[in-house]
Amino acid sequence: MKIVEVKHPLVKHKLGLMRENDISTKRFRELASEVGSLLTYVATADLETEKVTIEGWNGPVEIEQIKGKKITVVPILRAGLGMMEGVLENVPSARISVVGVYRDEETLKPVPYFQKLVSNIDERMALVVDPMLATGGSMIATIDLLKKAGCKSIKVLVLVAAPEGIKALEAAHPDVELYTASIDQGLNEHGYIIPGLGDAGDKIFGTK
């Protein structure tokens, strides 16, 4: 599995600000979007382009544009919505697919409860976004759904990832690509990432 830890200074700085315990909902939400945008820039670097001719200000001009069906952004509800705006800043024409998976806080197992995927997902690259890759269960369940629907190209974008989650994801889906702003220390006894960001969903939606 391709694993990319994006170590750009802007990513490091913004993620560092997100780790503050008393960060406001507004600021956390803004930073989640900004880091999501930067991760998207890196993750889409290998998109194929094609040359086309358009009418420029001084006559015909040859340009490059992304080839074929492009991208579907797949936020995992609910926290993934916090990164979606930043992703769409880079790929505004992307279609949106939504998957709902929550983690049972006692068993730590993923529980799928909703999915609404674009009809031609088999022709698109999926960018799956979720702030945290902890145990990997929710991400694996989401990718299971995408592959069942025919999706062949999948990239995962997360703000922070635990080694345990990376290992589980690689074992289940070695053909996907992972882009993260940080590979953190690991999980505590409750399955939360250390040092992590706390409960990203609560911080994004102001329910902490």
Swiss-Prot record:
Top EC class of this enzyme: transferase
Activity control note: Allosterically activated by GTP.
SUPFAM superfamilies in UniProt: PRTase-like
Biological process terms in GO annotation: UMP salvage; uracil salvage
Binding site residues for 5-phospho-alpha-D-ribose 1-diphosphate: R78, R103, D130, P131, M132, L133, A134, T135, G136, G137, S138, D199
Keywords: Allosteric enzyme, Glycosyltransferase, GTP-binding, Magnesium, Nucleotide-binding, Transferase
Residues reported to bind uracil: I193, G198, D199, A200
The UniProt record lists the keyword Magnesium: yes
InterPro entries linked: PRibTrfase_dom, PRTase-like, Upp_B, UPRTase/APRTase, Ura_phspho_trans
Cofactor list: Mg(2+)
Repeat as UniProt keyword: no
The protein's annotated pathway: Pyrimidine metabolism; UMP biosynthesis via salvage pathway; UMP from uracil: step 1/1
Record field: catalytic activity: UMP + diphosphate = 5-phospho-alpha-D-ribose 1-diphosphate + uracil
EC number: 2.4.2.9
Gene Ontology molecular function, alphabetical: GTP binding; magnesium ion binding; uracil phosphoribosyltransferase activity
HAMAP family linked: Upp_B (MF_01218_B)
Its job: Catalyzes the conversion of uracil and 5-phospho-alpha-D-ribose 1-diphosphate (PRPP) to UMP and diphosphate.
PANTHER family listed in its UniProt record: ADENINE PHOSPHORIBOSYLTRANSFERASE (PTHR32315), URACIL PHOSPHORIBOSYLTRANSFERASE, CHLOROPLASTIC (PTHR32315:SF4)
Name of the protein: Uracil phosphoribosyltransferase
Organism: Yersinia enterocolitica serotype O:8 / biotype 1B (strain NCTC 13174 / 8081)
